[in-house]
Swiss-Prot record:
The lineage of its organism: Bacteria, Bacillati, Bacillota, Clostridia, Eubacteriales. Pathway: Cofactor biosynthesis; thiamine diphosphate biosynthesis; 4-methyl-5-(2-phosphoethyl)-thiazole from 5-(2-hydroxyethyl)-4-methylthiazole: step 1/1. Pfam families: HK. It is an enzyme of class 2 (transferase). GO terms for biological process: thiamine biosynthetic process; thiamine diphosphate biosynthetic process. Its cofactor is Mg(2+). One of its GO terms (molecular function) is magnesium ion binding. The gene is thiM2. ATP binds at K115, T168. It comes from Clostridium botulinum (strain Okra / Type B1). Belongs to the Thz kinase family. It catalyses: 5-(2-hydroxyethyl)-4-methylthiazole + ATP = 4-methyl-5-(2-phosphooxyethyl)-thiazole + ADP + H(+). The keyword Kinase applies. This is Hydroxyethylthiazole kinase 2. Keywords: ATP-binding, Kinase, Magnesium, Metal-binding, Nucleotide-binding, Thiamine biosynthesis, Transferase.
Length: 265
């Protein structure tokens, strides 16, 4: 929990280049986590913005030519300045443009965290996926039958890229190739409003700003899962969204410790 308290105390500046569908919620969730968001995306300013930030998040949702250019500039700036960064592989399982771009970004920018659902992780690893648009395909969902092989794939991808790999879903798997965490927190309603994955990436960017990449990523995923559980007993999805942000802001360390469901593998 030291990472969480450090973020709240230091209020690090987080540069997050994301999509217009979720940008407002992403900025608010970063604020709720205790950090300060800046969502700059113009190619002529992003290097300057990234260079004064404590971490960078890039998100492939609703991709455009300008954002592709900007994310690459920011990613290289972050790498050159040893600023932690996370890439969210939104849609790489259904778009060759995004897949090719993500591979280029990973090769040239060396993100500290590669995050996506299992369809997206399989696609970036080079395995055919059954992605349903930006959502995970039914055949790619982690089950008892494919659990071990998926963990091995995630570990190999981590070792090949040098990045922490975070595969999110009903069960979340986070690995740096040596240490692997399995997280079972969360609820179905997290998949019923748009942008929760993008919001999670904002929290990951906030928590890895300390330089503690594996633990920061795992803590962000735990936090989102638990706050989803706490928020689901509401009238509907609109109320859920607001309750989720409120819980990210107000949850105590004691509740996190009480409700966390995490195992090492």
């Amino acid at each position: 929990m030291q990472i969480r308290q450090s973020v709240k105390l230091k209020k690090p500046l987080i540069h997050y280049i994301t999509n217009p569908i979720s940008i407002n919620d992403c900025a608010n969730i970063i604020l709720a986590a205790g950090a300060k968001p800046i969502m700059a995306e113009h190619p002529l300013e992003v290097s300057e913005i990234t260079s004064v930030s404590k971490s960078l998040g890039v998100n492939l949702g609703n991709i455009t030519d300008n954002k592709m250019k900007s994310m690459l500039i920011s990613g290289k700036t972050a790498y050159e300045n040893k600023i932690p960064q996370v890439i969210d592989l939104v849609g790489v399982g259904c778009s060759k443009l995004r897949l090719d771009y993500a591979k280029k970004f990973i090769l040239e920018c060396h993100p500290n965290v590669i995050k996506g659902n299992m369809s997206e992780i399989k696609a970036i690893y080079g395995i055919k996926s059954s992605a349903k648009g930006i959502d995970v395909g039914a055949c790619d969902i982690i089950t008892e039958q494919n659990f071990d092989e998926n963990i091995e794939m995630i570990k190999r991808l981590s070792m090949e890229t040098g990045s922490v790999v975070a595969a999110t879903g009903v069960v979340d798997i986070i690995s740096n190739g040596t240490y692997t965490y399995i997280i079972s927190n969360g609820c179905e309603m997290l998949s019923m409003i748009t942008g929760t994955g993008c919001m999670l990436t904002g929290i990951i960017a906030s928590y890895i700003s300390s330089g503690n990449i594996l633990e920061g990523t795992a803590l962000a995923i735990v936090l989102m899962g638990i706050c989803g559980e706490l928020s689901q007993h509401v009238k509907g999805t609109g109320s859920f969204r607001n309750e989720l942000i409120d819980n990210i802001f107000s949850i105590s360390d004691d509740i996190i410790i009480k409700k966390i469901r995490i195992n090492s593998y």
